[in-house]
Swiss-Prot record:
Protein purpose: CRISPR (clustered regularly interspaced short palindromic repeat) is an adaptive immune system that provides protection against mobile genetic elements (viruses, transposable elements and conjugative plasmids). CRISPR clusters contain spacers, sequences complementary to antecedent mobile elements, and target invading nucleic acids. CRISPR clusters are transcribed and processed into CRISPR RNA (crRNA).
Phylogenetic lineage: Archaea, Methanobacteriati, Methanobacteriota, Methanomada group, Methanococci
Stated name of the protein: CRISPR-associated protein Cas8a2/Csa4
Keyword Secreted: no
Highest rank taxon of the organism: Archaea
Family: Belongs to the CRISPR-associated protein Cas8a2/Csa4 family. Subtype I-A/Apern subfamily.
Keyword field: Antiviral defense
Entry-linked InterPro entries: CRISPR-assoc_prot_MJ0385
Encoding gene per record: cas8a2
Length: 375
């Protein structure tokens, strides 16, 4: 089967009695690593959705993730996943080829683009052409019905930051040697990352920083919540470091991203559920690569804050956040930490330091009302 550990357990099915007229399938991720498993799970969901599956639920269980699918008994779920995988890979690789730069070498022609599975979200330039070629081979093997079950594909830091010697111990995550996984899980992980994992690539002449945000559900999600998460992901997120220094900080970069990409309707849907975000930054300075930051914080709170303000005054919310971010870095950090840790005094202090900036009274009122919900 596509995912190791596929099983239907009697005790779990008992809680799904009302669906017994349907075929109930429980998919469990392999258990490689919390982040890698999350991307694999999102990949499974994307493949199923592309094949018209609507009755599915997605939830965490320990460091793994489960997808429950309820479909008529005559539906072959395995075939649907493979067809969805083929469809997703075709779309991803078509985008890569359409916007990519073609480079002739002695061996062949390399294609490098700003999509996430090429140069967009990979710090190591070996992967810029290598990953797309691997996904191309997997796509052709799906067509032939010859998916390899051998664990031969190296997982890059982008998909699993703990799988590499560049993970410092100070972040509380033990680094290790890169692991290898089979074709199906490799493709599923990249599909999940491509459609559900926001990232921001910032660079200048000597440095590149790639902030990656793995969105973790802390409770069960239905199809509507899952699809709303896709609004978080823009396909290309590249910025010049020289213009916006705040992008170096992963929390401030996320605040900017959410402010400028997330719709009010999607924010409203997502804030009804509990999520956390595991953020990590891949850094390349003067050809030295490393993971410089790794952390987890409450995404739901940040999104709820933005939804509350945007619902009141959409335009001025964007202007207000931009003014905060483009000011003093210490002020910006004080502001976002005040939101994440329910500290109204910190937010007020940051706002007071915005000298010569006119702030809409509606924004101030909305901030006070939002904090009032916690007291």
């Amino acid at each position: 089967m596509i995912i190791k550990g596929l099983r239907v357990e009697k005790e779990k099915l008992q809680s799904l009695q009302k669906f017994w007229r349907l075929r109930v399938m429980l998919f469990e991720t392999p258990g490689y690593n919390e982040i890698l498993d999350l991307y694999i799970a999102y990949g499974v969901v994307e493949c199923l959705v592309r094949e018209g599956v609507e009755n599915l639920r997605f939830f965490p269980i320990g460091n793994k993730y489960c997808i429950v699918v309820e479909e008529p008994t005559n539906v072959n779920i395995k075939n649907r996943i493979e067809k969805g995988m083929l469809n997703a890979l075709e779309d991803m690789l078509s985008l890569h080829k359409a916007i990519g730069k073609y480079i002739s070498t002695k061996e062949d022609i390399k294609i490098i683009s700003d999509v996430d599975f090429s140069a967009g979200a990979n710090i190591n330039n070996v992967y810029w052409d290598g990953i797309p070629k691997t996904l191309e081979k997997i796509k052709e093997n799906i067509k032939k019905g010859k998916l390899s079950t051998k664990s031969k594909n190296t997982v890059p830091l982008t998909l699993m930051p703990a799988a590499g010697k560049y993970m410092p111990k100070i972040y509380g995550v033990k680094g290790g040697n890169p692991i290898k996984i089979d074709d199906s899980n490799y493709a599923l992980a990249w599909i999940g990352f491509h459609y559900y994992a926001p990232y921001i690539n910032i660079s200048d002449n000597r440095a590149t920083y790639i902030h990656i945000y793995a969105i973790k559900p802390l409770e069960e999600l239905g199809l509507i919540e899952i699809l709303a998460l896709k609004d978080l992901k823009k396909k290309i997120n590249n910025y010049q470091l020289g213009k916006y220094k705040f992008f170096v900080n992963k929390k401030l970069a996320l605040l900017y991203h959410l402010t400028h990409t997330e719709s009010i309707s999607a924010l409203e849907i997502v804030t009804k559920k509990n999520f956390s975000v595991v953020s990590y930054t891949l850094e390349n300075v003067d050809n030295n690569q490393a993971i410089r930051s790794f952390g987890e914080y409450d995404l739901s709170k940040l999104m709820d804050f933005l939804w509350y303000l945007k619902a009141t005054d959409f335009y001025n919310t964007i202007q207000f956040v931009d003014n905060i971010l483009r000011g003093d870095l210490e002020v910006s950090l004080t502001f976002i930490d005040g939101i994440l840790y329910d500290d109204l005094d910190a937010v007020y202090s940051a706002i007071r330091k915005l000298k010569s900036v006119r702030i809409s009274p509606l924004i101030i009122q909305s901030i006070l009302e939002w904090f009032g919900n916690f007291y």
